[in-house]
């Protein structure tokens, strides 16, 4: 049995208070320490009601502190809020001492009464930039000034217009000194919490940001108890993300050392055995079958790289490995593909250079170890065909393919025959893979292909030939998976399943219901005893699981940060608000107006789906960076979802579709940088231009090289100082129309998008607008298509997406994809996905 006092630390202040509850009622817990894990689970299940009669929090204390791994408990909304109340320390939430506000103390001294001070504080935050910069400073990172979506000044003015200056100041009085982004997140969260829970909710919102360790402890507890799978628990989960990006807690020296030190590796990785190898074989057999996977002709593959190469970061190390010299400025992988003529894979000996960097995520900074582009090319060659053949029976390589609705359906489908949910949480999963295990995985995967011997040898050698370039020298990687490897998702997902198969044995694993994606695991097991056996066995074989983050029980399930219960599935509001405020910090490019609008629509919908107050769109429409110039009424319709940018989803039950059409001037002509390579473009044109594309080029005569090169070099673009002005797009409101026809969401989940007869000719999409209907009929005739089709563009390129009303709740991404799969005007969603 775990040490209850030590375990309590994982739950912050809530853990301390639960330990006190357990200590005060120790007579009720006599005998727990003499039972094995299964017996304790069974005893708690039977005693939960009796324990609750003694103290409402006692069953939670036993589950979280006295079990090897926590047991879910059915909690009413009132019981969940009782946990929230015990998670935070209200005594630390003190109103600012106005006399300490240097430069402004005399102003506050002249103001009468608390409400007057609140009004004046609200006035200053709305109108005094110097005051905001001093007492709500932006984080000291370039992206904080450029990339955040929501800034305090505009948000405060919108808040004051809706709720009044005094209400604004009454909240801000407890936030003085917070960074700008955290204050914004707190205000947005307080809006929802106050609407749901009254004035007490405002204190919880402030405490969620002021006390991040307590917020994280509460989140851990709610997940372990299963309260994350429904309201109100889901509203409080992952509140630690409200700290925003750039928390400066990452120790990169330690991160590098933990991958290169023999002692550190020995403590972290799961040793390879023949039994583990057999489990890897079983997973690969299940997902790939027995047929040999044909890899493409190497020359055909390499000369088509303009089509398949995906952008990613490119630095001096990657350039050096490819023989590219004297390049400066922002670099991307597609640029390198243009600059290299010969296929570098046959000459590759497996040597891989890794560049460490910091990824600024909401709530924490994370170390990224990016492998060089030569390694990317080599792994892409053999891994892409495997990914295309992958069945996804249990190991999911592309979770986004079926959408969150599809994910929830799979989980719910596994629950029809009874049983217990078991959600596992690997502790720092990348660090658990030994070099020998990864080499075995790649060798076994390659053995199912017709890969040449040199490639098999180089891939195997690459695992032991990986070096992190850090502080001017190369450090040999002795174990762990690099987070920026082309095979990161493949490796994690397969080994995720293989380790559990190894722990329980192949026969038992065959009988299990399980899903694996990255480091996420969902198991449906017959009994609590099976859960206990599985957890004990994973520990026995060396899997490091965080005991405070596992969850066992009947209440609900979680997979891919989606809480799933019998009535609906729900995402986590705090994480959505954090993303809404922070924006993306992957580059320092300012957001263009149309991108800003689309981002605001998607992120506001995510917040509303997860339970945000209905007044949120009004605040966002006035404060989201990049939306100036759009009419306020238009923005409110789009952000609330009652209208859409055509084509797209409309969130209404009225069967009326309201749409806006975007009118945007063409972008400035792209100028290829002087001396830029164009090998990928020229190789593709020479080797892969189809007869249909050649005919179309003859008809339309576009500047095809410039169009192709813009996709390779356009992301880097000119610097911010020289970037040409992009004219403001205009929104044109269309007449409302009645939505005709109905589709069910589950019917659309597995349905593909109908392609046109010219869809297999990718160059055409670069200049399709230059082709007249008569031009298209001539091209369609070349491939034997229907030249008399009423809509010749649909015949050529497939039916365009249409707008549909969403009768229910769906994430914007799922809803947009479903609009592409049906011509019906209404999509019925019987099981809501609130994410």
Curated annotation (Swiss-Prot):
This is Probable RNA-directed RNA polymerase. InterPro entries: DNA/RNA_pol_sf, RNA-dir_pol_luteovirus. Belongs to the totiviridae RNA-directed RNA polymerase family. One of its GO terms (molecular function) is hydrolase activity. The lineage of its organism: Viruses, Riboviria, Orthornavirae, Duplornaviricota, Chrymotiviricetes. Its EC number is 2.7.7.48. SUPFAM superfamilies: DNA/RNA polymerases. RNA-dependent RNA polymerase which replicates the viral genome. Catalyzes the transcription of fully conservative plus-strand genomic RNAs that are extruded from the virion into the cytoplasm where they function as mRNAs for translation of viral proteins and also as substrates for encapsidation to form new virions. Once encapsidated, the positive strand is converted to dsRNA by the RNA-directed RNA polymerase. Keywords: Hydrolase, Nucleotide-binding, Nucleotidyltransferase, RNA-binding, RNA-directed RNA polymerase, Transferase, Viral RNA replication. It is an enzyme of class 2 (transferase).
